[in-house]
């Protein structure tokens, strides 16, 4: 946006639009102001023909240069087919309709944290991926708003407060022409499904792998379960008994041995496992409330014989969800269990062991700071022990050299006395 139009043309366009200078680059507000001023300056409405012509010229040049900002970076490899100027009237919100805000940010509390690595296919995460690809493929060291439309470039340009940034950024992208964002609309509607191996290796437990929550039971429609997993399509299906085995309350790994261990029957007593099957517990989690019986079985035999119908995936509501990031009440901190000392444990190994035992009790946002502090303490302990070892070796070497010098001096004195006799 800093290279769009000259400084004089910028000031003139903002003067005609009657907007302050800090709104330069906000395409939605500028377009709304352009429509209002067009009604006032139109010759048929009693306006000035010269001012109307000047406004149309500057506004058309502005849109053309914004369109060419990313095109001037070179081939990016992920751009979709570009439209002509006639197709710029189709905004992002018009493309996705009433469900734009759900498509914009699939899981606000998760997408805001996953800055570098995310398999989500919402608009927010896709624009962040474009930022990384533009820097890598186009060798663009510094990107500004217009060349990139990600959240970080938006915040850097406007300096938006953190608590309001999500809604303001959503409104900013909503009025932007979908053609300028280089988004594959099909990937937003139909996100790619991850392979079973990647889903099993995931370290974050999603709804699809941790059973049914009370919220899902209350919001599901048509006796269906709503499952949301980042990067995979969350499809509402009618519940069947096999779905309970694939959605246990615990994260488990299936193996075959004897005797069998009934892990899930403590939560779902109606589930019957075969005798040669055992479920090995990987990481215990808090059990969810038991699923209501009316959601476990169909209401009639006719409903049970109907084929499975896939409904449109569900998304978390975005409005006011980001406000929950800062809780009003103090969250109680759990005290980690005491550490049992072991023989032969170095100081830095003890620090790392203490940090690993606290990993399940500290908040997620403090994990990085805690790991940095542990790393620094481990380095200090390691450097001190290495310094002591080096000092001990030096003292041993000096003692050996002194003893060797004393022996040589003694031999020299004995040889000298023997010659006198």
Swiss-Prot record:
The keyword Membrane applies. Coiled coil: none annotated. It is found in: Host membrane. The chain crosses the membrane at residues 395-415. Residues 12-75 form the J domain. It is a single-pass membrane protein. The modification Phosphotyrosine is found at residues 250, 315, 322. Residues 416-421 are extracellular. SMART domains: DnaJ. The modification Phosphoserine is found at residue 257. Residues 1-394 are cytoplasmic. Keywords: Early protein, Host membrane, Host-virus interaction, Membrane, Oncogene, Phosphoprotein, Transmembrane, Transmembrane helix. Residues 215-235 have a biased composition (Polar residues). It comes from the Viruses. Residues 215-237 are annotated as: Disordered. Plays a role in transformation by modulating the activities of cellular proteins involved in control of cell proliferation and by acting as a functional homolog of an activated tyrosine kinase-associated growth-factor receptor. Recruits upon association with host Ppp2/PP2A the Src tyrosine kinase components Src, Yes and Fyn, thereby activating their kinase activity. Activation of Shc1, Pclg1 and p85 mediate signal transduction pathways leading to cell cycle progression and cell division. MT also plays a role in regulation of early and late gene expression and in viral DNA replication. Interacts with host Ppp2/PP2A A and C subunits; this interaction alters Ppp2/PP2A substrate specificity and localization. Interacts with host Src, Yes1, and Fyn. Interacts with host Shc1, Plcg1 and p85; these interactions lead to cell cycle progression. Interacts with host 14-3-3 proteins. The NPTY motif is required for interaction with host Shc1 protein. This is Middle T antigen. It comes from Murine polyomavirus (strain BG). The lineage of its organism: Viruses, Monodnaviria, Shotokuvirae, Cossaviricota, Papovaviricetes.
């Amino acid at each position: 946006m800093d290279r769009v139009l000259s400084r004089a043309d910028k000031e003139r366009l903002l003067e005609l639009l009657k907007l302050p200078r800090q709104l330069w680059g906000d395409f939605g507000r500028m377009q709304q102001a352009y429509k209002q001023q067009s009604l006032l300056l139109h010759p048929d409405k009693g306006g000035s023909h010269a001012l109307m012509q000047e406004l149309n010229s500057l506004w058309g040049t502005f849109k053309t240069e914004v369109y060419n900002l990313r095109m001037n970076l070179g081939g990016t490899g992920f751009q979709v087919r570009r439209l002509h100027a006639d197709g710029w009237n189709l905004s992002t919100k018009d493309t996705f309709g009433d469900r734009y805000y759900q498509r914009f940010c699939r899981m606000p509390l998760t997408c805001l944290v996953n800055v570098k690595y995310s398999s989500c296919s919402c608009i927010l995460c896709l624009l962040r991926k474009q930022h990384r690809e533009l820097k890598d493929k186009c060798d663009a060291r510094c990107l500004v708003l217009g060349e990139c439309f990600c959240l970080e470039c938006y915040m850097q340009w406007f300096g938006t407060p953190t608590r309001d940034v999500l809604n303001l950024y959503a409104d900013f992208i909503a009025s932007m022409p979908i053609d300028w964002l280089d988004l594959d609309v099909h990937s937003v509607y139909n996100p790619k499904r991850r392979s079973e191996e990647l889903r099993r290796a995931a370290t974050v437990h999603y709804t699809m792998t941790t059973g049914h929550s009370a919220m899902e039971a209350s919001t599901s429609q048509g006796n269906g379960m709503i499952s949301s997993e980042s990067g995979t399509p969350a499809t509402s299906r009618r519940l069947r008994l096999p779905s309970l085995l694939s959605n246990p309350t615990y994260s488990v790994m299936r193996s075959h041995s004897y005797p069998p261990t009934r892990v899930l029957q403590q939560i779902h007593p109606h589930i019957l496992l075969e005798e040669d099957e055992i479920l090995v517990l990987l990481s215990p989690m808090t059990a969810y409330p038991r699923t209501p019986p009316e959601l476990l079985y169909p209401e009639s035999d006719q409903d049970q014989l109907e084929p499975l119908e896939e409904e449109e995936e569900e998304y978390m509501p975005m409005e006011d969800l980001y406000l929950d990031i800062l809780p009003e009440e103090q969250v109680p901190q759990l005290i980690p269990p005491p550490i049992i000392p072991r023989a032969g444990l170095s100081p830095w190994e003890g620090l790392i062991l203490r940090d690993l035992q606290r990993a399940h009790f500290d908040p997620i946002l403090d994990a990085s700071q805690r790991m940095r502090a542990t790393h620094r303490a481990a380095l200090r302990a390691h450097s001190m022990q290495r310094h002591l070892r080096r000092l001990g070796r030096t003292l041993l070497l000096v003692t050996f050299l002194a003893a060797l010098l004393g022996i040589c001096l003694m031999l020299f004195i004995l040889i000298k006395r023997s010659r006198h006799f």
